[in-house]
């Protein structure tokens, strides 16, 4: 399986495009100059387009992905606020942009050529929405609102329009600060990393979503300010990882067979201030970006234990924040 890694560095306005080999080595394919400070990225499910959010002219840039993973800019669409997180629905028909600082969420159609267009809906008065996450059925959008300690739930119709389901909203612990989410690849379990108390909430849906476990991601003797960031799961659903920026840690959880119980298994030092990381499609490698180190690092994931072993580090642009991986 050929894989390509994209890293976004906002302070140098660059995307670095890498080829990932089966041993975990990276080879630089392309350096792309972006028309703005590039932050969140997402790949269309068709595998043919990469979308990136930029500032200070808040926009979504559409890139065509070539056969070897290289990028070519196609179009730019406006955003109603600074993009914190972007995602698509599972059919690749709509893009969602959550804006933490502008307290809104926008919905954008994606045309038949893969271009993101101007928003068809803007949901206002959300308190610090930090991500937008479509469910496995492609029917509901889960939006963690950090300053509310709520995960808001929106029903999506066939035209991409959202209607909030207030009765389905999830309430976290006071001061938790829900941020990013990961979905089990085979089960119905969903996991949310809370930025401010560094817990992971495990969600299960019966008639509505419930938190069935909340577990601390940090060592018992952790004394720094808690500042968690990202969360990802291996493709086999056996291991879950989170990142913490104050002490630059990756935390590892073992996941129960049914998916609803996490066991903290270890902590690993990584790049300084790991704002974003990703796991490759084979589940063999974890790639972390260091917002304060201007490097990314590749670590091997032990298939059985989930333990991480760092393999190599690579310089990128300034303040790398996002890592996205494509299987060609």
UniProtKB/Swiss-Prot annotation:
GO MF term set: 6-phosphogluconolactonase activity
GO BP terms: glucose metabolic process; pentose-phosphate shunt, oxidative branch
GO CC aspect terms: cytosol
Keyword Nucleotidyltransferase in record: no
Enzyme class: hydrolase
Biological or metabolic pathway of the protein: Carbohydrate degradation; pentose phosphate pathway; D-ribulose 5-phosphate from D-glucose 6-phosphate (oxidative stage): step 2/3
Regions crossing the membrane: none
The keyword Hydrolase is assigned to this record: yes
Superkingdom: Bacteria
Keywords in alphabetical order: Carbohydrate metabolism, Glucose metabolism, Hydrolase
Enzyme Commission number(s): 3.1.1.31
Catalytic activity: 6-phospho-D-glucono-1,5-lactone + H2O = 6-phospho-D-gluconate + H(+)
Function: Catalyzes the hydrolysis of 6-phosphogluconolactone to 6-phosphogluconate.
Family from the record: Belongs to the cycloisomerase 2 family.
PANTHER family linked to this entry: 6-PHOSPHOGLUCONOLACTONASE (PTHR30344:SF1), 6-PHOSPHOGLUCONOLACTONASE-RELATED (PTHR30344)
Entry protein name: 6-phosphogluconolactonase
Native source organism of the sequence: Xenorhabdus nematophila (strain ATCC 19061 / DSM 3370 / CCUG 14189 / LMG 1036 / NCIMB 9965 / AN6)
């Amino acid at each position: 399986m050929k894989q390509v890694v994209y890293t976004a560095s906002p302070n140098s306005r660059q995307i670095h495009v890498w080829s990932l080999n089966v041993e975990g080595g990276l080879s630089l394919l392309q350096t792309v100059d972006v028309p703005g400070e590039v932050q969140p990225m997402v790949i269309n499910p068709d595998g043919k387009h990469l979308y990136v959010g930029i500032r200070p002219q808040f926009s979504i840039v559409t890139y065509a992905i070539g056969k070897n993973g290289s990028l070519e800019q196609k179009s730019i669409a406006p955003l109603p606020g600074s993009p914190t997180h972007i995602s698509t629905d599972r059919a690749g028909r709509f893009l969602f942009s959550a804006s933490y600082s502008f307290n809104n969420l926008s919905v954008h159609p994606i045309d038949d050529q893969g271009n993101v267009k101007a928003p068809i809906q803007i949901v206002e008065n959300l308190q610090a929405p930090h991500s937008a996450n479509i469910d496995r059925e492609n029917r509901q959008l889960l939006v963690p609102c950090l300053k509310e300690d709520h995960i808001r739930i929106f029903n999506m119709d066939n035209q991409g329009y959202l209607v909030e389901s207030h009765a389905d909203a999830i309430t976290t612990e006071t001061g938790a600060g829900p941020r990013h989410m990961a979905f089990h690849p085979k089960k119905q379990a969903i996991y949310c990393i809370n930025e401010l108390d560094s817990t992971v909430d495990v969600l299960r849906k019966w008639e509505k979503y419930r938190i069935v476990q909340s577990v601390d991601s940090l060592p018992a003797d952790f004394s720094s300010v808690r500042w968690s960031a990202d969360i990802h799961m291996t493709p086999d659903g056996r291991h879950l990882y989170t990142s913490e920026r104050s002490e630059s840690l990756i935390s590892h959880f073992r996941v129960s067979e049914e998916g609803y119980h996490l066991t903290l298994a270890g902590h690993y030092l990584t790049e300084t201030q790991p704002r974003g990381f990703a796991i490759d499609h084979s589940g063999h490698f974890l790639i972390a970006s260091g917002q304060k180190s201007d490097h990314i690092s590749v670590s091997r994931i032990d298939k059985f234990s989930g333990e991480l072993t760092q393999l190599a580090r690579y310089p990128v642009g300034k303040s790398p924040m996002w890592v996205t991986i494509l299987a060609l």
